[in-house]
């Protein structure tokens, strides 16, 4: 018992942080009433001081840890609440509205080449033309499809006409939760203006405090404009990333180079950036202060220098945008400087824990951000792994004059230390990287060994030194930036070289949470066994356990392989204005019917939605893809799937359609070794008890356009599903005239439910028990049409829209078809889960 108490005593602060973080997790996910939470808070406040006084024994330690867990529950519950102020924009906007708003530009706008984004701090809004302005508070994220006007700088009061709405998440398990990400930045409403003509500056008087508040962002904006004007596009984007924390102007290809090489963290201002900048400031200031004899005699010059660095680092944090990663890095830097000034630098675990506690106490929801998880996982893994490896790689150097052999040995030690530190960071962050990004950069240690010095020790110092000269001697600033750009060019070239090597970056399914926990437990056990006096067999056993769990992360077992379910499942994915339907057959093979959707971001719908869903489901292979017709909203996500899911065969309606993207897709499929087949009427695309048949290739009978497509029928027993693609009403009538068997239990509405399709005659022939519409949220009055809504209402046919329900899953059983939808899709984004399905309806199989 004494050994347990001693272990807790030596690591008391880390235990408190873990308990506090676990409490935040519990409070954020559990729907606890606020009165219970406040009772917990009062209890903690009363009992905690007593526990500190009695923390010398084990019961005192455990009670204190428990109270920190309760404090975490309180913090997690309160921080995950929706805004409750009546004038908050979140409570004024419950649906999409055309709004006139007055607000102040809060930060430097970003521009990715097509769209500008800006944070606006609201003062008032007007809903409709007949109502007066009413007070409004809160921050909105404004998007404009044009470059931001340079005359509107941070602090400018603007009148804005925009479409406002609460941000909507794609209802697809495994997909990035954008509304939750915004909510953690205290943004609960987004806005869209069609052009810069809908922005107008308002003359107003500001106080001195307001002017001071916006100075860092004004300076940041000016630095960004200088970088754009005095360096080329790619270099300006890189400098913006490492100096200002703005990655929006980086070309897509450059971003992919850094992602694939495992060096994306270098482009985010983090601990390593502030460490380099802090070391540079410390060296310059220390050299200057040592010129003073009085300071040398009366003070500890190193500690004075460290304290002077504090406000300078804080100022740079403000200049870099004060984003969460920058603030976190600044807090950690300040913690280490204070520890240095108090001679407490040897307690590394306590320093890391204290920094984490400060961050979580000030912003509990930071726990759920990827940057927080990766930063501390890397930091802790390096701190734990390197002491074990260090004795194995360091040669003892002889004292005296440095010989060539000693210099070589010193360089070898440094290179090996850097390589193993990078490897330790990769091992420590691997589960988190795979969980959030579905990829593991195997070349990360080598890439970091080369690229970190090029960017952090070459480009970053010269870029930082250029900052004070921008406003005074721009020629010197330009010269320094030019020197630093050499490191950036070399880093990009090396990253491009890494990407050209096959299999240096693996795309992997999302691991189960329990597997991630077991991985870290095994890693900790292996490291502890190396430092304790235990038998060699147990050391080897812990190492084997760790290697096994690492293998399970890279080569996971599909959940369907260990399932006894013999049912077929059909998933209608929420891809916006498009269509993508995944079919899982009882033998655990898969077919995707169409794979396209809304195309408004850098990533295609395949990378953004379909692939994450497949990985989240444990699927790494797609046996078949069927494309009903060449339109982009049915095909634009398929190229990514062809690259990463070992597709065996592709069924299409036509080889040539005049659509360049579609024809390039077919060429790409052939390069990948995919068997490309044109489907004809009556072709069996999948045989067995769950069969898929091509009822018609309408392009061969009715010409091009939306009618150039396949009509697909899925049958399991007496249950039928119909996928008509985007055919119009004339083609529907043609199918009826040809005597096609159209009767189906489930119908995926033609052309996303538009009025040009889904004729009453066609619907009468199909006689569906349920109609599903795959459409986006932006044009809900058109997709589905009023005629289809009315038809379903009169006949009491359930009309399920992916724009409202999210993804819709069907389980095709012998006697029934169960329809399930995601639970809590409309809840507070900080509390909802995107992986909980809830059965809402059962359809009895109709008898022949």
What is the predicted function of each stretch?
Residues 2-10, 14, 18, 106, ...:
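Aromatic-rich juxtamembrane segments at the membrane interface
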Residues 104, 128, 147-157, 161, ...:
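Non-globular, low-confidence helical/coil segments that flank catalytic cores
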Residues 1-92, 96-98, 200, 205, ...:
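N-terminal leader/targeting segments
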Residues 7-53, 369-372, 376, 478-530:
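Membrane-embedded alpha-helical segments of integral membrane proteins
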Residues 422, 449-453, 750:
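Transmembrane helix-bundle signature of multi-pass membrane transporters/permeases
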Residues 208, 212-230, 238, 246, ...:
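Hydrophobic alpha-helical segments of integral membrane proteins
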Residues 11, 15, 23, 55-57, ...:
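Hydrophobic alpha-helical transmembrane segments in multi-pass membrane proteins
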Residues 2-6, 66-265, 608-615, 621, ...:
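Membrane-interface helix/helix-cap signal primarily in integral membrane proteins
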């Amino acid at each position: 018992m004494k050994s347990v108490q001693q272990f807790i005593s030596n690591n008391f602060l880390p235990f408190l942080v873990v308990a506090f973080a676990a409490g935040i997790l519990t409070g954020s996910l559990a729907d606890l009433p606020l009165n219970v939470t406040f009772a917990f808070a009062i209890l903690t406040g009363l009992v905690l001081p007593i526990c500190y006084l009695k923390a010398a024994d084990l019961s005192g330690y455990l009670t204190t840890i428990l109270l920190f867990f309760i404090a975490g529950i309180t913090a997690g519950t309160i921080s995950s609440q929706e805004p409750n102020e009546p004038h908050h924009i979140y409570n004024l906007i419950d649906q999409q509205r055309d709004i006139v708003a007055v607000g102040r530009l809060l930060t430097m706008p970003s521009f990715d080449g097509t769209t500008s984004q800006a944070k606006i701090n609201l003062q008032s809004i007007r809903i409709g033309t007949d109502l007066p302005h009413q007070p409004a508070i809160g921050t909105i994220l404004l998007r404009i499809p044009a470059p931001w006007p340079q005359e509107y700088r941070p602090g400018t009061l603007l009148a804005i006409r925009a479409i406002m709405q609460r941000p909507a998440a794609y209802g697809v398990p495994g997909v990035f939760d954008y509304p939750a990400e915004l909510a953690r930045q205290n943004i609960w409403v987004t806005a869209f203006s069609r052009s810069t003509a809908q922005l107008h500056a308002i003359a107003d008087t500001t106080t001195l405090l307001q002017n001071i508040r916006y100075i860092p962002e004004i300076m940041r904006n000016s630095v960004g404009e200088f970088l754009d004007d005095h360096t080329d596009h790619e270099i300006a984007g890189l400098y913006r990333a490492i100096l200002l924390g703005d990655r929006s102007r980086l070309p897509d290809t450059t971003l992919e180079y850094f992602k694939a090489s495992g060096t994306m963290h270098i482009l985010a201002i983090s601990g390593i950036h502030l460490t380099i900048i802090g070391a540079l400031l410390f060296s310059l200031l220390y050299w200057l202060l040592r010129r003073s004899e009085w300071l040398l005699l009366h003070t500890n010059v190193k500690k004075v220098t460290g304290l002077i660095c504090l406000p300078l680092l804080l100022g740079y944090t403000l200049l870099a945008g004060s984003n969460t990663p920058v603030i976190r890095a600044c807090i950690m830097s300040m913690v280490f400087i204070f520890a240095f000034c108090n001679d407490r630098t040897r307690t590394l675990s306590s320093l890391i824990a204290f920094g984490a506690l400060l961050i979580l106490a000030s912003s509990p929801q930071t726990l759920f951000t990827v940057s927080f998880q990766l930063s501390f996982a890397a930091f802790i893994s390096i701190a734990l792994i390197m002491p074990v490896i260090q004795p194995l790689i360091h040669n003892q150097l002889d004292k005296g004059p440095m010989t060539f052999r000693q210099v070589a040995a010193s360089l070898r030690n440094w290179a090996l230390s850097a390589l193993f530190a990078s490897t330790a960071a990769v091992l420590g962050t691997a589960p988190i990287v795979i969980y959030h990004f579905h990829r593991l950069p195997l070349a990360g240690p080598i890439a970091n060994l080369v690229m970190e010095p090029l960017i952090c020790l070459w480009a970053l110092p010269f870029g930082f030194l250029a900052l004070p000269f921008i406003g005074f001697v721009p020629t010197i600033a330009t010269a320094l930036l030019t020197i630093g750009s050499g490191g950036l060019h070399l880093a990009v070239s090396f990253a491009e070289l890494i990407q050209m090597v096959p299999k240096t970056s693996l795309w992997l399914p999302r691991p189960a949470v329990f597997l991630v926990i077991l991985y870290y437990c095994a890693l900790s056990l292996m490291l502890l066994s190396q430092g304790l006096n235990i038998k060699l067999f147990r050391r080897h056993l812990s190492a084997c356990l760790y290697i096994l769990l690492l293998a399970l992360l890279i080569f996971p077992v599909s959940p369907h392989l260990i399932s006894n379910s013999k049912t077929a499942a059909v998933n209608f994915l929420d891809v916006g204005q498009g269509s993508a339907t995944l079919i899982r057959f009882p033998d655990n093979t898969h077919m995707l019917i169409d794979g396209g959707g809304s195309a408004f971001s850098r990533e295609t719908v395949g990378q953004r939605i379909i692939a994450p869903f497949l990985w989240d489901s444990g699927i790494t292979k797609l046996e078949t893809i069927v494309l009903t017709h060449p339109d982009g909203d049915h095909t634009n996500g398929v190229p990514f799937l062809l690259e990463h899911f070992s597709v065996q065969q592709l069924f299409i309606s036509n080889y040539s359609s005049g659509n360049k993207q579609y024809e390039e897709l077919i060429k790409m499929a052939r390069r990948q070794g995919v068997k490309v087949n044109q489907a004809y009427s009556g072709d069996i695309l999948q045989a067995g008890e769950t069969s898929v048949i091509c009822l018609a290739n309408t392009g061969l009978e009715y010409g091009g356009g939306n009618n150039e497509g396949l009509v697909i029928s899925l049958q399991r027993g007496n249950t039928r599903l119909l996928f008509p693609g985007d055919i119009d009403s004339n083609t529907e009538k043609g199918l009826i005239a040809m005597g096609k068997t159209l009767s189906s239990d489930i119908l995926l509405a033609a052309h996303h439910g538009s009025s040009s399709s889904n004729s009453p005659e066609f619907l009468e022939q199909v006689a569906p028990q349920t109609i599903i519409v795959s459409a986006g949220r932006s044009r809900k009055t058109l997709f589905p049409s009023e005629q289809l809504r009315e038809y379903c209402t009169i006949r009491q046919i359930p009309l399920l829209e992916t724009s409202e329900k999210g993804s819709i899953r069907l389980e095709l059983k012998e006697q029934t078809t169960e329809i399930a939808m995601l639970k809590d899709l409309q809840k507070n984004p900080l509390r909802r889960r995107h992986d909980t399905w809830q059965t809402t309806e059962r359809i009895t199989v109709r008898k022949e």
